Amino acid sequence: MSEQFEMIAKTFQGLEEILAEELTALGANDIQIGRRMVSFTGDKRMMYKANFCLRTAIRILKPIKNFTAKDADEVYNQIQAIPWEEYLDVNKTFAIDAVVFSEEFRHSKFVSYKVKDAIVDYFREKTGKRPSVRINNPDVLLNIHIAQTTCTLSLDSSGESLHRRGYRQEAVEAPLNEVLAAGMILMTGWRGECDLIDPMCGSGTIPVEAALIAKNIAPGVFRKGFAFEKWVDFDADMFDEIYNDDSQEREFTHKIYGYDNNPKANEIATHNIKAAGVSKDIVLKLQPFQQFEQPKEKSIIITNPPYGERISTNDLLGLYQMIGERLKHAFVGNEAWVLSYREECFDQIGLKASQKVPLFNGPLECEFRKYEIFDGKYKEFKSQEEGEEKKEGEGEQAPRFRERKEFKPRREGEFKPRRDGESRPRREGEYKPRREGGDFKGGDQRDRKPRGEFRGGRDSRGPREFRGNREPRIPKKEEE
């Protein structure tokens, strides 16, 4: 039996339950929900699958040591006691991310320096040589988390944040994070059973993530690589098997519609959709929401309208008034989900939300609200809807956000919220300098064929071909 070990999947606040459900479906064990994280146990294959398949995880950490420390010297001694040759070659590079919630350790950079010193001194004493530190694209990325005096040192198996799927070619200003977009879609219970509409789709993040969910395409298939591919115990054959397994992918018989009134956004969305290989599933149209008409088929709206950071208040309130008007007159019999962080914007919609889910979009504390659009009174609408479902004899219904399985809470003392006035470390994905994706040019790294549609049709009967270094995932633009 393969060795089982603990792992931690980091995510955004508000997506923890969705992530736990994903891990359950993946076959993970001992799932416990914490704040912006979910812990679980599994083997090496599970770690590879978690990185490759999870839509709402930012990164997957593998803890290698838990200890308590009251000062920097204790941290140094505990780190130096680790047999580092099991995790790092002296000729390889490494980097350290520190996350600190502690009165004893107030500066995360100082903690990083102490960890670095302990590792360097370990190798210098053992071999007379030392590994080098490389901030961008290191061979091994370490994460140390300190909550008061409780310390956890982990290997970061992901490297570049998992929200960087690899299909995004360009972006509009302040694009929606891919992990958040996927989490929003999964919260609604939609899995491709009807058409999906984003009337303000920007660079196309929601439509692309929706297509990947509907077709059950793993989000990791577009990535250049993962940090674990540079580990000393990397099993290339095992990961190739996971990468090449498309047996869970499925057909999508409906359509996803993306609208926007910005020509540049429409152009960018077109490139991103093509890079993801889902152009056949998404219909893009340059159209303002004012011209939105009642869809012929049952549909769901999931959208992330502007919040007002770059729009005047009057224009913003007018926009949300228009959203409410279009929903009431051109989306009857369907449901719409809207993300925003301003209460006055929601007020302008003029509809009563049947569900409100708190979410964070970067530093903004938002709400994701569900609106059920109907004619007449709400009670009549619900009784008619329930009667139709009973008459049709439908079995399982799409899962509802409030009816999820309960998971064990994370043990106390870990990932505590900060006190008032206490400095807050950077959230995952927030204002973090981009760490370039793995270069993976070494001879022992086996690159895989990208799946973008511009690479031609794929033979589903056999594995993807390996063609050396991965090619760009979208053709270069022809010179005019």
Named regions from a protein language model:
Residues 101-104, 161, 306-310:
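A short, flexible beta-alpha/helix-coil linker loop
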Residues 287-404:
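C-terminal catalytic and target-recognition region of SAM-dependent MTase-like enzymes
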Residues 99, 124, 145-187:
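Class I S-adenosyl-L-methionine
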Residues 176-294, 309, 317:
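Conserved S-adenosyl-L-methionine
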Residues 23, 96, 144, 304, ...:
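Residue-level signal for inorganic ion chemistry
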Residues 2, 370-480:
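Basic Arg/Gly/Lys-rich low-complexity intrinsically disordered segments
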Residues 45-52, 160-163, 377:
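Short, charged/polar, Gly/Pro-enriched secondary-structure boundary elements
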Residues 2-138:
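Non-catalytic nucleic-acid substrate-recognition regions in nucleic-acid-modifying enzymes
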